[in-house]
């Protein structure tokens, strides 16, 4: 996991803005980060697709090591900034996508048996028209490979709607 340092003042000379440091000037973001750093919440596990923001705590008497806790994440994933927990920030390493800071989030790993996996779905394009003047939409398919799966009355109805659409 890459460590990104966030500064509200100036960035020290040994750090490089856009590489391993972000300079935050917006008061809302600074307040949210300070509030998260001062809270007594436990550290959360990190997702390998995100970068964790860690706040250093005071040194402990027993070990002389600084403890840290995760106070937020940064990501280039598609999330909308809401101004409460998700904020826009600078890009790192000339990224093509906007980077966001997510503060006060918890990471939840869903059981794979309750989610649709990439190998379990087939996405078909919606039927289209060959010419804009055609009255009917057309879909070219190969062979009779439709299988309707159902288990109850509601799913029967939804399967029938899909077959009619197809």
Swiss-Prot record:
InterPro entries from the UniProt entry: Lipoprotein_10_C
Top-level lineage group: Bacteria
One Pfam short name: Lipoprotein_10
Family: Belongs to the MG185/MG260 family.
Protein name from the UniProt record: Uncharacterized protein MPN_282
Source species: Mycoplasma pneumoniae (strain ATCC 29342 / M129 / Subtype 1)
């Amino acid at each position: 996991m890459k460590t990104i340092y966030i500064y509200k003042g100036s960035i020290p000379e040994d750090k490089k803005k856009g590489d391993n440091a972000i300079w935050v000037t917006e008061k809302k973001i600074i307040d949210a980060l300070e509030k998260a750093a001062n809270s007594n919440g436990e550290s959360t596990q990190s997702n390998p697709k995100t970068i964790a923001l860690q706040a250093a705590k005071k040194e402990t008497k027993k070990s002389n090591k600084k403890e840290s806790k995760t106070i937020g994440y940064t990501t280039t994933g598609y999330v909308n900034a809401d101004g409460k927990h998700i904020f826009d920030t600078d890009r790192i390493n000339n990224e093509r996508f906007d980077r966001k800071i997510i503060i006060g989030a918890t990471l939840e790993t869903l059981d794979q048996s309750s989610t649709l996996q990439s190998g379990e779905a087939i996405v078909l394009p919606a039927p289209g028209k060959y010419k804009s003047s055609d009255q009917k939409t057309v879909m070219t398919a190969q062979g009779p490979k439709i299988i309707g799966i159902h288990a109850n009355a509601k799913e029967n109805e939804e399967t029938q709607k899909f077959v009619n659409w197809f």
